[in-house]
Design a protein with these regions (language model features):
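Active-site beta-loop-alpha junctions enriched in small/polar residues
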Residues: 9-13, 28, 82-86, 106-108, ...
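Structural preference for beta-strand elements that scaffold enzyme active sites
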Residues: 3-9, 22, 76-80, 98-102, ...
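Active-site glycine- and acidic-residue-rich loops that bind
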Residues: 78-90, 129-147
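Hydrophobic alpha-helical segments and helix pairs
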Residues: 88-120
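Glycine/Thr-rich beta-alpha phosphate-binding loop at enzyme active sites
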Residues: 105-115, 136, 142-180
């Protein structure tokens, strides 16, 4: 018997589905960013104990939310989102409330962006299945602050930043276990 939920993270969650697993799709920005397939082919590579990628946030964009809302079946898929311009308002107001959403605040393959405490509170209010994806370099105080704002689910973590892209797998597991 498996306790808890098994998650399949991006980029693999975009393409692979198993029974009793939740796929995390994305990460999606509000506006479209072309080149996903080319960047996947170009940058996803096996490395010792894991994978390397430099996909960034190439995605179809969430500005046409109707395209995604049909596939956002409660309990099966979760959409990871990021506001590269730190404007979270369209996500809060346009995504149907109650759907499983992951706020990605820790991607090493793009520039920095932020989210305010007020925006976190709004996401917590409108999305009961909210989770936050963190950086492997996250400060424990930041996790405590998010928890005090109502976040109860944390995705540990995004990839380890390197000059070749983000590294996942065993090297990341060693870092994340210290945060559990």
């Amino acid at each position: 018997m498996i306790l808890g939920m098994i998650y399949i993270s991006p980029p693999f969650g975009n393409y692979i589905s198993y029974k009793n697993c939740k796929r995390i799709k994305g990460t999606l920005t509000w506006e479209k960013s072309r080149g996903l397939i080319k960047q996947c082919i170009k940058t996803i590579r096996p490395v010792k104990g894991g994978w390397c990628n430099a996909i960034g946030f190439r995605n179809p964009g969430m500005s046409n939310i109707k395209r995604f809302s049909g596939s956002m079946r409660r309990g099966r898929d979760c959409y990871s989102i990021a506001a590269l311009d730190s404007n979270w308002s369209p996500f809060i107001t346009q995504i149907p409330h109650g759907l499983p959403i992951e706020i990605n605040v820790g991607c090493p393959n793009v520039g920095s962006y932020t989210i305010s405490d007020d925006d976190i509170r709004l996401f917590v209010k409108h999305f009961s299945e909210l989770q936050v994806k963190l950086s492997p370099t996250v400060d424990l105080d930041y996790i405590k602050r998010l928890h005090s704002l109502g976040v109860r689910n944390f995705h540990l973590s995004n990839t380890i930043p390197t000059d070749r892209g983000g590294i996942s797998g065993y090297p990341l597991k060693r870092i994340n276990l210290t945060l559990v």
